[in-house]
Amino acid sequence: IDWLKLGKMVMDVL
């Protein structure tokens, strides 16, 4: 799991 990409996706959603 790419946590950096996951975190970026979360930030984009918020």
Swiss-Prot record:
The record's account of tissue expression is: Expressed by the venom gland.
Gene Ontology molecular function terms on file: G protein-coupled receptor activity; toxin activity
Q: Where in the cell is it found?
A: Secreted; Target cell membrane
Modified positions (Leucine amide) are: 14
- Membrane found in the keyword field: yes
Q: Which GO terms describe its cellular component?
A: extracellular region; membrane; other organism cell membrane
Q: Which cysteines are joined by disulfide bonds?
A: none
Function recorded in the entry: Antimicrobial peptide. Is active against both Gram-negative and -positive bacteria (Escherichia coli (MIC=38 uM), Pseudomonas aeruginosa (MIC=310 uM), Staphylococcus aureus (MIC=19 uM), and Bacillus cereus (MIC=38 uM)). Also causes moderate mast cell degranulation (ED(50)=100 uM) and low hemolysis (MIC=50 uM), and exhibits chemotactic activity for polymorphonucleated leukocytes (PMNL).
Family membership: Belongs to the MCD family. Mastoparan subfamily.
Instruction: Please give the name of this protein.
Output: Polybia-mastoparan-III
Query: Organism source for this protein?
Result: Polybia paulista (Neotropical social wasp)
Q: What is the lineage of its organism?
A: Eukaryota, Metazoa, Ecdysozoa, Arthropoda, Hexapoda
